[in-house]
Amino acid sequence: MATGGAAGEDVPGGGEFYLRYYVGHKGKFGHEFLEFEFRPDGKLRYANNSNYKNDTMIRKEVFVSPSVLREARRIIQESEIMKEDDNNWPEPDRVGRQELEIVMGNEHISFTTSKIGSLVDVQTSKDPEGLRIFYYLVQDLKCFVFSLINLHFKIKPIQS
């Protein structure tokens, strides 16, 4: 695990910040997955692998500002995911798996569960409240990361 640098120290509450999310499965088209991570030095890494119709893996890396790391940390703190436990969540299966790892300050959590198709899967689980928090946090984080990646790679610099 990387240690916090200047970017990690600039987040509310101080200390290290690291986040990694993975969702994927192995099936008809091979190993298909989506993965992203925020590193303490501000590097955002993104990978999307789909072999459907012979697509190739998409990999993007970008450095984000301390304010972006603060926003990612705020999203996580407001979700209260750090209070949850994945013991009663569905185990990964042939449909796929999800992993979420977060380090904030001196707290470190790591969740593993199956792919969640819809809120019906959440409501019928043994821990619907905890899994609902996970489900919505993942939706928020994916939206945040997709926006950052799309903005960074589509916006052209202003020529003066």
Curated annotation (Swiss-Prot):
Keywords: Cytoplasm, mRNA processing, mRNA splicing, mRNA transport, Nonsense-mediated mRNA decay, Nucleus, RNA-binding, Translation regulation, Transport
PANTHER family linked: MAGO HOMOLOG, EXON JUNCTION COMPLEX SUBUNIT-RELATED, PROTEIN MAGO NASHI HOMOLOG
Similarity comment text for this entry: Belongs to the mago nashi family.
Main location: nucleus
Biological process per Gene Ontology, one example term: RNA splicing
Quaternary structure, from the entry: Heterodimer with Y14A. Heterodimer with Y14B. Part of the mRNA splicing-dependent exon junction complex (EJC); the core complex contains MLN51/CASC3, EIF4A3, MAGO and Y14.
Induction per the UniProt record: Induced by gibberellin, abscisic acid (ABA), auxin and brassinosteroid.
The keyword Metal-binding appears for this protein: no
Organism annotation: Oryza sativa subsp. japonica
Lineage, highest ranks first: Eukaryota, Viridiplantae, Streptophyta, Embryophyta, Tracheophyta
Protein encoded by which gene: MAGO2
One Pfam family here: Mago_nashi
Intracellular or extracellular location(s): Nucleus; Cytoplasm
Function of the protein: Core component of the splicing-dependent multiprotein exon junction complex (EJC) deposited at splice junctions on mRNAs. The EJC is a dynamic structure consisting of core proteins and several peripheral nuclear and cytoplasmic associated factors that join the complex only transiently either during EJC assembly or during subsequent mRNA metabolism.
Protein name: Protein mago nashi homolog 2
